[in-house]
Amino acid sequence: IYHYTTMKKVFLIFLSLIFIFTFQVKAITLEDITSGKFQSKDIAEVYPSADGVHYFTATNGNTRIVKCEYRTGHEVDTLFDVKTARECNLEQFDGFSLSPDEKHLLIYADSEPIYRRSFKATYYTFEIRRNLLKPLSDGGKQQAAVYSPNGRMVAFVRNNNIFIKKLDYGTDCLLYT
């Protein structure tokens, strides 16, 4: 009998807990759904460093590119700042990518959407060691700029033509029309 009453008490406690927690749940309304209450939060774009210890990200409303430590999240170094970069007339930028050797940045600004995820923008190359920002090319906005595997050239599209910019010489040549 003792075992039966103990089981009965445990069952009643368990049942009452279920009812308590069930009735405390707030109903989801249409307003909750349409207001974006359950919308996921984006994190800033993060580019991992080759050393595996650091990452690069844009801060201050896309006016700086900093190197941070994964372990602490603290800034270790500033790679680019629109206020201190030489020959920089940008107030802010829209995005960036890092060369494979991590000596140059490809920074773009004044983006114009084309279709879904594609866009045209004014691209710039930034030499980190010299703190110098230069336009990638003259002649209009570029698309799909990407570094070569060795980081010495940048391929891009302008007016449906494919170009290559040789960073060592500062020249760009038409590759395919």
Question: Regions from the language model: what does each represent?
Answer:
Residues 58-82:
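Beta-propeller domains
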Residues 115-121, 157:
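Short, solvent-exposed loop/turn segments at conserved positions within beta-propeller repeat blades
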Residues 34-64:
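Beta-strand-rich domains and repeat architectures in extracellular enzymes and scaffolds
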Residues 50-51, 100-101, 149-150:
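Residue-level detector of Asp-centered blade-edge/turn motifs that repeat once per structural unit
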Residues 176-177:
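Conserved small/polar residues in nucleotide/adenosyl-binding loops
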Residues 70-72, 128-131, 167-170:
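Short loop/turn segments that connect beta-strands within beta-propeller blades
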Residues 74-102, 112, 140-141:
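Blade-loop segments of beta-propeller domains
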Residues 54-55, 105, 151-154:
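Hydrophobic beta-strand positions that form the internal "hydrophobic ladder"
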